[in-house]
Amino acid sequence: MNLVVTALVKQVPKGDHSGRLDADGRLERAGAVAEMNPWCRRAVAQAVRLAGETGGRSTAITMGPAAAVDVLREALAWGVDDAVQLSDPALAGSDCLVTARALAATIRLLDDPPDLILVGNSSVDGSTGAVGAMLAELLGLPFTGPVLALEPADGRLRTTVQYDAGTESVTIDLPAVVAVAERSCDPAKAPADTWPSPDVVRQVTTADLAEGSWGLAASPTKVAQVHPAPLTRNPVIFRGHPQSQATRALAELTARGCFQQQSTPPRSGRQAAGEGSGAAPAPSEWTGLQVAAGQASRLPSTTPAPDGGAASRPLSTERRGAPRGEVVVLVGDGPVEGTRALLGAAAALAAEVGGVVTAVATEEGDREFARWGADSVVTLDGDEPRAVARALTGWLQGRGAWAVLGAALPWDREVLARLAVTSDAGLMSDLVSLSAKEGRLSGLKPSGGGTLAEIISRGTPQIATLRTGLLPLRTPRDDRPLEPQTLHVEPDTAIFRTERRTGSDGDALDRAEVVIGVGRGVPPEKYDELEPVRLLLNAELAATRKVTDQGWLPHGRQIGITGRSVAPRMYLAVGLSGNLNHLAGASRAGTVVAINTDPAAEIFAHCDVGLVADWQEVMPYLVDGLRSCVSG
């Protein structure tokens, strides 16, 4: 089979961008040095490989301003046969749904319909991870990803899909849309002096597309404002002999209460997630999705902190006025603690807007879901994302649902991205908090330059995915039975799944009290030297994107804008520079401790306690001191 392969590529700012908005409310990118998105480099490399190996043809498409032609020139230099740029001022401010529509319309202009459309799994400037699935829905195609390996066979594509907790073998019918993982291959990088002239790129405007509405005005979601991340930490930096630094740092951490009695880390399983709760305390009305106590100072006022600890705040049984709609929560096979936190967040929102919570789940769990916040439960009898989205589309018609929420995980992302297309509602993706503002949903997500972008939606229903590791666990309410309901889901014969392999316990990061983050300054053969401090602190190991890209730690251990977000009691950053895209994932840590040999490293501006030292020299002294701190 001579494969016709199309790779979608995006130009992104190189490094951190400012996060500022222009006069029209769009993220300001003028003057920033730009490059091809790292994930898109893999899509280009795979497109060239597959087309070359099968005697086919490859095309690269980008949507962006005139300067974005450079990513196509680089793709052509790498070996892509054709390139198309969609560029029009009318497209400025397009959200992911309008972007997907414009790209779908551009693909329909191609002389040869593609057998395979490759997209990067994410982007360093937005991390929606939704355009690929939206594009698949618009084109009526199956979707899978992020894939580590892909090979054509008899009109189908055999892939290995990467998840936080391992991999899965997936075979998918062609034509299809596939998201490419960053570790799938070496990136397509060509020296600028080898790029061809821009004249060889085919130029397309909205006038060439089928009739449609474009740009910010047509987008159901938008960035309302960008909140700067204030430097709320007051770093205490130590220098000198490693032993002296360790002694002084431990004294500072002890004074901060960092070594007070640690609670037992949450165990997996629904029983553990709700164990020991007993009867619910007296009802206490929620006023929106809250963050853990003591962490609100690092967030705008849209997410007020509760009076008590995050794990002790009870679920509310009160509703304000007559129900005006419902908050639907999509429950897949993600971490149990994440499901509990998400249902609690939904109950908070429902209390705010006078609604109810309906859990739509792939497996039965009526009693647990009810205790965690659900007022009703619907069980799906199938779990293929495309088919689930179709079933939900029909089920939601006429219900007047106020919002549909899911976790920021691959299954939830695909279902809700497809639902965003069929409902014309758009998607707010990878949010770290939610609130109700004037009866509408508002969410925050990490943006460039260490900022938080406030996203709003005018769609109906309002659809969002959340990073559940940052949501508080609420005390379950009284056990009560719910009437079982079932929603039929048709099978999807275009996709076949086999052999799911578990390779990572990255989900443990979501509720870890202490996290040790490692950068490239800690080579993998030295990880054993971190074991004593990890065991003493009962900590989980995490990493920067560059570490996981190199395969030193599993992808599920990555923290940052394009990885996980955590809120531990203490975050120990070892051998990492402090890139703001990484620190966005640990911004809600109670105390940040940094160890780096470079006194000018960015991490020292965003920590509470810093040690200017070689981690291998200072760590033995820290371990010796920690033994008495922890035991005491």
Predicted features along the sequence, with ranges:
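N-terminal glycine-rich FAD/FM-binding segment characteristic of electron-transfer flavoproteins
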Residues: M1-G632
